[in-house]
C-alpha cells in the first residue's frame, strides 16, 4: 500500500502503540495531544514514560500540540481519546478539516448522558462529505504487549467493508493482524461492555475467589453483553469473535487491564476515588457501568452482573454482597437462544 499520512488523536498507551504499528508499516504518523510536556518528550526523547517506562519510539513518529498541524493533508484520522471527550475533539476536527478523510476510532465506551456509541458521535459531529463511513478498531489487545510487537489480532468494523479493508491494510503486518466485520453495533458494544465484566472479574480475584468463579463471571458476562447487544441490533455471532469473547478474555483475566485492576482494588475494599487517583488513567468500565445499567433499565434487558457492579459503585452497596446476591437469582436456562 502507498504510504499514508495518519493522525493519531490521543497519546495514551493504546494510541501510542497503534502509532508505532502504523509507523512500522511505513506510514507517516502524527500523534496529537494536549499535554505539552508529553508531546515534547515524544519528539525530543522518543519516549512516552507515562505509559511505557522502557520503550523507545521510532524517531519518525512526530507529536503535535496543534490539532491543525496534525491534520494537515492527512489521509486518515484515528481517534484514541477517552469516551467523555470524543465529541469535543470531533467538533474540533470538523472545524479544521478541509478535505475528505478516512475516520477511525479505537476507544471503547458509551457516552454518558446520550448513551451513544462512539461511531454515532463521530457521524453526528463530522459532516458526511468530509469523511468515510466510520471504522471501529477493536479487539483483544494490551498496549503493553503491542508496543513490544507481540502478536495481536483485532477487528476493523464498518458499514462499508471497502473502508474496513483499507484500515485492515494500513495496520496489518507480521505481528499485528486485522479481520474485517460489518457489525459495528456488535463490535462497539462488545468493546465497551466487556470493561464492566472485567471490573467484576477483578473484584472476585480481590475477594479471594478462584478460577471457577472467574470463569463463571466471564461466560455469564458474555451472555448479558450479547443480550443487550442483540436488543440494540447487533449480530449475536459477533460476540463469539475477537471483539467479543476475545476481548473479554484478555480484559477479564489480566493484570494489564486497568478495569481488572480497578475491580481487584474494589474487591480488596479500597475506595473508588482512591483507586482512580492511584491509577492515574481513565477507567472506562466505571462510567460504562452507569450507561449500560441505564440502557438495560430502559429496554428491560436482564443484566445481573452489570447491576451488581452498578450498585457497588454508584449506590454504595458492598461489592461482595452484591455479587453473592446473584447466586439467589431465579434459576434459568443457559441457552436463552434455544426456542425449544
Curated annotation (Swiss-Prot):
The active site is at 194 (proton acceptor). NADPH binds at residues 13-14, 108, 143, 258, 282, 284. GO terms for molecular function: glycerol-3-phosphate dehydrogenase [NAD(P)+] activity; NAD binding. The keyword Cytoplasm applies. It is found in: Cytoplasm. Sn-glycerol 3-phosphate binds at residues 108, 139, 141, 194, 247, 257-259. GO terms for cellular component: cytosol. It catalyses: sn-glycerol 3-phosphate + NAD(+) = dihydroxyacetone phosphate + NADH + H(+); sn-glycerol 3-phosphate + NADP(+) = dihydroxyacetone phosphate + NADPH + H(+). Its EC number is 1.1.1.94. The keyword Amino-acid biosynthesis does not apply. Keywords: Cytoplasm, Lipid biosynthesis, Lipid metabolism, NAD, NADP, Nucleotide-binding, Oxidoreductase, Phospholipid biosynthesis, Phospholipid metabolism. Belongs to the NAD-dependent glycerol-3-phosphate dehydrogenase family. Catalyzes the reduction of the glycolytic intermediate dihydroxyacetone phosphate (DHAP) to sn-glycerol 3-phosphate (G3P), the key precursor for phospholipid synthesis. PANTHER family: GLYCEROL-3-PHOSPHATE DEHYDROGENASE, GLYCEROL-3-PHOSPHATE DEHYDROGENASE [NAD(+)] 2, CHLOROPLASTIC. This is Glycerol-3-phosphate dehydrogenase [NAD(P)+].
Amino acid at each position: 500500500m502507498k504510504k499514508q499520512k495518519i493522525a493519531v488523536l490521543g497519546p495514551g498507551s493504546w494510541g501510542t502503540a497503534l502509532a508505532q504499528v502504523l509507523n512500522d508499516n511505513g506510514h507517516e504518523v502524527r500523534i496529537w495531544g494536549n499535554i505539552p510536556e508529553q508531546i515534547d518528550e515524544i519528539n525530543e526523547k522518543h519516549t512516552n514514560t507515562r505509559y511505557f517506562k522502557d520503550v523507545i519510539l521510532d524517531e519518525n513518529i512526530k507529536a503535535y500540540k496543534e490539532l491543525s498541524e496534525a491534520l494537515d493533508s492527512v489521509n486518515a484520522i484515528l481517534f484514541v481519546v477517552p469516551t467523555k471527550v470524543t465529541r469535543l475533539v470531533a467538533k474540533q476536527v470538523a472545524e479544521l478539516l478541509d478535505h475528505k478523510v478516512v475516520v477511525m476510532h479505537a476507544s471503547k465506551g458509551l457516552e454518558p448522558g446520550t448513551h451513544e456509541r462512539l461511531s454515532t458521535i463521530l457521524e453526528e459531529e463530522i459532516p458526511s462529505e468530509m469523511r468515510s463511513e466510520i471504522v471501529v478498531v477493536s479487539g483483544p489487545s494490551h498496549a503493553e504487549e503491542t508496543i513490544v510487537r507481540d502478536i495481536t489480532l483485532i477487528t476493523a468494523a464498518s458499514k462499508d467493508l471497502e473502508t474496513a479493508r483499507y484500515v485492515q491494510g494500513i495496520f496489518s503486518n507480521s505481528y499485528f493482524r486485522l479481520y474485517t466485520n460489518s457489525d459495528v453495533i456488535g463490535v462497539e458494544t462488545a468493546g465497551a461492555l466487556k470493561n464492566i465484566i472485567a471490573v467484576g472479574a477483578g473484584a472476585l480475584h480481590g475477594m479471594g475467589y478462584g478460577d471457577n468463579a472467574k470463569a463463571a463471571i466471564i461466560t455469564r458476562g458474555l451472555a448479558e453483553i450479547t443480550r443487550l447487544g442483540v436488543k440494540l441490533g447487533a449480530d449475536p455471532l459477533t460476540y463469539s469473535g475477537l471483539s467479543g469473547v476475545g476481548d473479554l478474555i484478555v480484559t477479564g483475566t489480566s493484570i494489564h487491564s486497568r478495569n481488572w485492576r480497578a475491580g481487584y482494588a474494589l474487591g480488596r475494599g479500597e475506595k473508588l476515588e482512591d483507586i482512580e487517583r492511584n491509577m492515574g488513567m481513565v477507567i472506562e468500565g466505571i462510567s460504562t457501568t452507569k450507561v449500560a445499567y441505564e440502557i438495560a433499565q430502559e429496554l428491560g434487558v436482564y443484566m445481573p452482573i452489570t447491576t451488581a457492579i452498578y450498585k457497588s459503585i454508584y449506590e454504595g452497596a458492598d461489592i461482595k454482597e452484591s455479587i453473592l446476591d446473584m447466586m439467589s437469582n431465579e434459576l434459568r436456562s443457559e441457552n436463552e437462544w434455544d426456542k425449544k
